[in-house]
């Protein structure tokens, strides 16, 4: 179908789409007041490290400080904008990213027009890119260097197809952009090279048969341009290469960090069906080349085919022992796939409009074809933004995505400013993912953030994230690889303790049951007067911990006017059970009648003999409570999420109640199998296959002292305020509607019980 739109009108519409793209993206970014995305804080911490310390390879704030392997091209450009204009980082960063994201619209238009001389495909491609969900998500989660790098790759591929530019100018532009790309984003550089190097080889192969001198020169010109680009970036590459090698030696990218490897496999693997589906547009470009240009293997068809297939196949690189966030590789496929859809739509419109000649008088064919093309194009442009197609995000979906990635509003940013102004410059913070990245970036304080391992890369970040997640959630963790026991300590009645069982279906252990000190109740007589005491109501006296090569345990003692209460939690290194004992010592003229436990369970309860089982079919795990010498009366509540244990004591002497709580992976959901498994479980039965069996112990007091943590900051909607308010080791220093900040009282940590 011949061109139906004049070049000047076509370019005017493309500029209008570019303008629309800017306005739409600005609206999404400003919809939350502050730009959405945790990575905005990360980028600002890199900018501050460059401006204040002049260091490209170290981030002095992010994840407690350490190596920074985020290439600084975007950050240097943005810091120049900030210094030149005086605008803050949270304004400069998204503005730069919005500009480059919108330039992708023009790149889509120019690439499609240059590659295939079709009437409306370039405009459809530009419109689709303007509303591309994947590009918008990348902008809204703060992947600004990714946005810039993808735009540069599109611009580079456009230069590859420009044959009317002088060789000298082409080499200059390609080498400059290649060098800039290397300086901006490492993963994009790697994908770019994996596309370009096969392209050079294929061009060499097919240029031998070509009679055109330009075709024979192109591989050499492209190879020279890439080489010059590397020479431009060589000083940076020489400086950053040792840092890469050192971190790769520690397991980065090669699966050496087990936590990252497991999390990536469980959450970031791209389905093979999606990879196979991407082959359709990849090889279709060759078919389009045959129809619209003649030969099958033209430069344009080879380029677009490689552009689609290479990133898709790279998502399966875990087969070869290479690990990264594989979903990010899918962003490289978006542009060629959208161009494919635009070409397909143009082809379909042309096919339908040509069909009207069978239904129309000869003198009206051109007029009717034009009307049909206009109607069908309008329908496509209406369907894209207002449909629920997963590749596009109209206004409704766009604002939903922006809200999903929203991290800070005015109250949160007020707290960040307070941190910057009111805390020592060397104070170390612990915070949650997202908000914590803003604390490090805009509060300019070293911050350990509780980020999930699949979103981390550099080895030192994993321990920092694990420490932060644990400190915000629990005070003590006892983990032997089979079970994990968490306890909030004696100041806060919530999980006292919680038992989690390792699951095959999750990277995190699955919570199966927990007790609460406020629901462990002692019924007793003081003289002739009946009384009731919840364990949490008895003042905490001391917390002691003990570690050996075989086990770890926590001992908490409480004293009331009538009773002394001691709770002991012990985990052995190769057992699937935790020993929980409670000793109640009545004082003079006091006798204990009953002790009641409420056990919260996460699954179906099964009771027989001296044991209670808890089966969670979704997680494929089973928990178990085994009673000691005395067997309580067991009552299941109607909602089946709680079990009541009542011990009939009737004694004025010391009382000791022993429970073994544990769990195991259920290989079958068959009722007979489960009952047999529960009946055969003993303390020593479950063993770790590895000879390296050990028990890991997390003590919040020791960790905070060792790492010199000064403040805990978190959103009130994310973590318990009461957990820190009740603990004398923390002092509330800032509170608003959204955020709480606690100062760590080091002296209180040292005074509390014994550590280790």
Predicted stretch roles:
Residues 482-677, 681:
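Beta-strand/loop-rich accessory regions of lumenal/periplasmic or secreted enzymes
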């Amino acid at each position: 179908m011949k061109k139906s739109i004049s070049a000047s009108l076509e370019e005017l519409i493309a500029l209008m789409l570019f303008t629309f793209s800017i306005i739409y993206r600005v609206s999404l970014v400003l919809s939350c007041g502050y730009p959405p995305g945790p990575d905005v804080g990360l980028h600002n911490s890199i900018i501050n490290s460059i401006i204040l310390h002049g260091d490209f390879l170290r981030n002095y704030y992010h994840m407690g400080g350490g190596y920074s392997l985020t290439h600084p091209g975007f950050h240097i450009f943005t810091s120049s904008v900030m210094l030149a204009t005086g605008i803050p980082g949270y304004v400069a960063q998204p503005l730069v990213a919005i500009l480059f994201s919108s330039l992708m619209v023009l790149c889509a238009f120019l690439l499609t027009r240059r590659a295939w001389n079709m009437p409306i495909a370039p405009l459809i491609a530009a419109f689709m890119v303007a509303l591309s969900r994947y590009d918008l998500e990348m902008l809204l989660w703060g992947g600004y260097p990714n946005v810039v790098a993808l735009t540069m790759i599109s611009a580079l591929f456009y230069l590859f197809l420009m044959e009317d530019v002088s060789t000298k100018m082409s080499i200059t532009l390609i080498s400059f952009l290649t060098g800039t790309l290397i300086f901006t984003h490492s993963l994009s550089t790697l994908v770019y090279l994996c596309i370009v190097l096969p392209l050079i080889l294929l061009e060499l192969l097919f240029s031998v048969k070509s009679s055109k001198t330009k075709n024979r020169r192109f591989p050499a010109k492209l190879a020279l341009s890439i080489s010059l680009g590397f020479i431009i970036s060589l000083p940076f590459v020489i400086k950053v290469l040792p840092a890469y090698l050192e971190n790769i030696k520690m397991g980065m990218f090669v699966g050496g960090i087990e936590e990252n490897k497991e999390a990536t496999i469980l959450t970031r693997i791209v389905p093979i069906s999606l990879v196979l589906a991407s082959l359709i547009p990849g090889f279709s470009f060759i078919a389009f080349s045959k129809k619209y240009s003649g030969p099958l293997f033209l430069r344009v068809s080879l380029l677009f085919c490689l552009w689609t297939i290479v990133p898709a196949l790279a998502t399966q690189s875990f087969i070869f022992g290479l690990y990264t966030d594989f979903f990010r590789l899918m962003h490289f496929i978006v542009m060629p796939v959208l161009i494919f859809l635009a070409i397909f739509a143009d082809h379909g419109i042309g096919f339908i409009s040509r069909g009207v000649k069978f239904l129309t008088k000869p003198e009206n064919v051109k007029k009717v074809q034009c009307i049909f093309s206009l109607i069908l194009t309008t329908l496509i442009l209406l369907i894209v933004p207002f449909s629920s197609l997963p590749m596009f995000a109209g206004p409704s979906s766009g604002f939903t995505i922006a809200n999903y990635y929203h991290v800070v509003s005015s109250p949160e940013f007020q707290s960040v400013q307070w941190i910057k102004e009111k805390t020592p410059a060397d104070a170390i913070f612990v915070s949650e993912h997202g908000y914590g990245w803003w604390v490090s970036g805009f509060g300019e304080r070293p911050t350990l953030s509780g980020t999930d391992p699949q979103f981390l890369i550099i080895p030192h970040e994993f321990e920092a994230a694990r420490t932060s997640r644990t400190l915000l959630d629990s005070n003590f963790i006892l983990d032997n690889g089979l079970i994990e026991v968490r306890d909030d300590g004696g100041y806060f009645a919530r999980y006292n303790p919680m038992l989690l069982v390792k699951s095959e279906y999750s990277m995190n252990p699955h919570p199966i049951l927990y007790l609460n000190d406020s629901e462990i109740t002692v019924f007793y007589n003081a003289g002739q007067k009946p009384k009731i005491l919840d364990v949490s109501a008895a003042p905490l006296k001391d917390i002691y911990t003990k570690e050996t090569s075989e086990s770890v345990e926590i001992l908490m003692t409480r004293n009331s006017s009538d009773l002394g209460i001691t709770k002991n939690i012990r985990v052995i290194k190769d057992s699937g059970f935790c020993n929980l004992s409670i000793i109640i010592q009545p004082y003079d003229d006091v006798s204990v009648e009953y002790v009641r436990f409420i056990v919260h369970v996460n699954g179906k309860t099964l009771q027989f003999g001296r044991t209670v089982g808890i089966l969670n079919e979704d997680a494929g795990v089973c928990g178990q409570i085994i009673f000691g010498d005395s067997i309580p009366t067991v009552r299941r509540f109607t909602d089946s999420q709680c079990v009541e244990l009542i011990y009939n004591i009737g004694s004025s002497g010391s009382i000791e109640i022993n429970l073994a709580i544990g769990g195991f992976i259920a290989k079958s959901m068959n009722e007979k199998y489960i009952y047999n498994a529960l009946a055969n479980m003993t303390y020593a039965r479950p063993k770790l296959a590895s000879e390296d069996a050990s028990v890991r112990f997390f003590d919040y007091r020791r960790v905070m002292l060792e790492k010199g943590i000064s403040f805990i900051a978190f959103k009130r909607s994310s973590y318990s305020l009461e957990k820190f308010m009740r603990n004398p080791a923390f002092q509330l220093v800032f509170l608003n509607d959204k955020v709480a900040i606690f100062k760590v009282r080091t002296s209180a940590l040292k005074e509390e019980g014994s550590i280790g």
